Amino acid sequence: MAENLYRARSRVYSPSVLFLHPDMGIGGAERLVLDAALALQEYGCDVKIWTAHYDPNHCFIETRELSVQCAGDWLPRSLGWGGRGAAICSYVRMVFLALYVLFLSGEEFDVVVCDQVSACIPVFKLARRRKRVLFYCHFPDLLLTQRNSALKKFYRAPIDWIEEYTTGMADRILVNSQYTASVFKETFKTLSHRNPDVLYPSLNIGSFDLAIPEKIDDLVPKGKQFLFLSINRYERKKNLPLALRSLVQLRNRLPSQEWDKVHLFMAGGYDDRIPENVEHYKELKKMVQESDLERHVTFLRSFSDRQKISLLHGCLCVLYTPSNEHFGIVPLEAMYMQCPVIAVNNGGPLESIVHKVTGFLCEPDPVHFSEAMEKFIHKPSLKATMGLAGKARVAEKFSADAFADQLYQYVTKLV
């Protein structure tokens, strides 16, 4: 990073950059926005973040190093009825936020970086002093929802059109993986002439290097030796039941004396304002009870960074269960902490994990996952060898320096 600071001082001019993000909570998208903002700030840019929701008690601690402003949190997140209408409410919140920033905030900036919701882009493009816009597409939003009824299809049609049209208004489009780039091209037919650039998320290595793992004795039940860890938000699309079903299959593969030493930590982002988080947590708890896994599973909701680092240090491996994941920052965190990863063999993990070197890429079924889990129990040296390979891969391919330099080049070319 010292080299970055030297380069920043040597520049005559660095642009002013404003980030626009729907909700600065705790998730992969928020981690990327935060890392991007910190990287540009270190390169000498004047950086500000504006968001529709920010809770200092439910966010990454590094947000305190940045100027984070909030507007529009009074607007509804959904139309009620179990979270229905969340998409249109998100669009309204982001358009309001863009209008507020442009006309009421007094902010001066050269480039806008926005992500997740593209509906705000026209506000900046149609302003009297048009702003240059960089849009980071984590994944086409229209693919993240079900259309199980004619009413839902009718509701989504204009939203999907707005997403595609406004995404095309960005001056530059970035995606998080080659996989997402291919899906982008297949999904947005009218944008076939646009070729998004791939900017892999980076890992904030400094925070991991400085952290001292704590003892996890208070978290680990007595007698447990073979510890596994699942890290993901409490959302159904993350396929968390796969981890529990894999645990059931593992029980069938092990003698009772070994099974008694097995424990799984189900950890991840949880927000009681989000109905799906609350509902899915209850579903998983019920599944644990019905599968007779109470003595083998511990749920951790919105656990701290220190707890995460300590668990990654103490567990045999991470179970990463989402299918067709856009990229996934969790495998990078695990590999850098020398904790191998068992992941589904599609989507982003194909670009981050090397099969049988830094972890295992498996079919998304409990049998294959449990087979990989058993390997770590019966061959303890696997964690050490795969862990070293994983850390080396993250340092080589997903370094913060490479991410920062590439992002800075994209931003400065817009000015």
UniProtKB/Swiss-Prot annotation:
The keyword rRNA processing does not apply. InterPro entries: ALG2, Glyco_trans_1, Glyco_trans_4-like_N. Pathway: Protein modification; protein glycosylation. One of its GO terms (molecular function) is GDP-Man:Man1GlcNAc2-PP-Dol alpha-1,3-mannosyltransferase activity. The keyword Cytoplasm does not apply. CDD domains: GT4_ALG2-like (cd03805). One of its GO terms (cellular component) is cytoplasmic side of endoplasmic reticulum membrane. This is Alpha-1,3/1,6-mannosyltransferase ALG2.
